[in-house]
């Protein structure tokens, strides 16, 4: 939880605010190994697709853990528009959520 008044920044948001381009990749394979490989590839962000991909919340947690430490922002496309699901995605450690 952020202290009151502190803004939430990600590497991707910071680069966009500076007018710089970002590069990312879309993950539809529910594998932490793929997430780690792409996390190490130098992308600014990765989008984990839970809407059309095979992953559930446990797969997501494994993917986020595999990406951690490589400086890549992790965004997640939620499987549906449900606030409980969105909260679970954010609690798992995602930097942002795309809601279909």
Regions found by a protein language model. Give the residues of each.
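Expand to "…catalyze enediolate/carbanion chemistry for C-C bond making/breaking, isomerization
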Residues: 1-100
């Amino acid at each position: 939880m952020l202290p009151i008044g502190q803004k939430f920044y990600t590497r991707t948001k910071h680069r966009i605010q500076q007018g710089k381009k970002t590069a990312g990749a879309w993950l539809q394979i529910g594998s932490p190994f793929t997430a780690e490989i792409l996390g190490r590839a130098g992308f600014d962000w990765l989008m984990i697709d839970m809407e059309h991909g095979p992953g559930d919340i446990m797969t997501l947690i494994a993917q986020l853990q595999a990406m951690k430490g490589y400086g890549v922002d992790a965004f997640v496309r939620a499987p549906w528009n449900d606030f409980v699901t969105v909260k679970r995605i954010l609690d798992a450690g995602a930097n942002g959520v795309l809601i279909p």
